[in-house]
Regions:
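Positively charged, phosphate-engaging catalytic surfaces used for nucleic-acid and nucleotide handling
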Residues: 1-75
């Protein structure tokens, strides 16, 4: 992904993390609470099999839609 899209995507990931603070369900592996920023980044990496920086530019819109899905469906 080019630097401009990568920067935009990182900002969207941060905003999604801000939105999800306190919304993720409790988990026994995270007794002090879950990190919503890491959650979004890990979900993106898992779905697209690459770090957000390494996803092709052609998939930018798809990644943004997926992040919106994560915000609407905290898990």
């Amino acid at each position: 992904m080019n630097k401009e899209n990568s920067s935009k995507l990182w900002k969207i990931i941060q905003e999604a993390g801000d939105y999800l603070v306190g919304q993720l369900p409790n988990h026994p592996n995270h007794p002090k609470g879950r990190n919503p920023y890491a959650h979004v980044a890990i979900c993106v990496k898992s779905k697209f099999n690459a770090s957000y920086k390494d996803i092709p530019d052609e998939q930018y819109d798809e990644v943004v839609k997926y992040i919106e899905f994560l915000k609407e469906n905290p898990s």
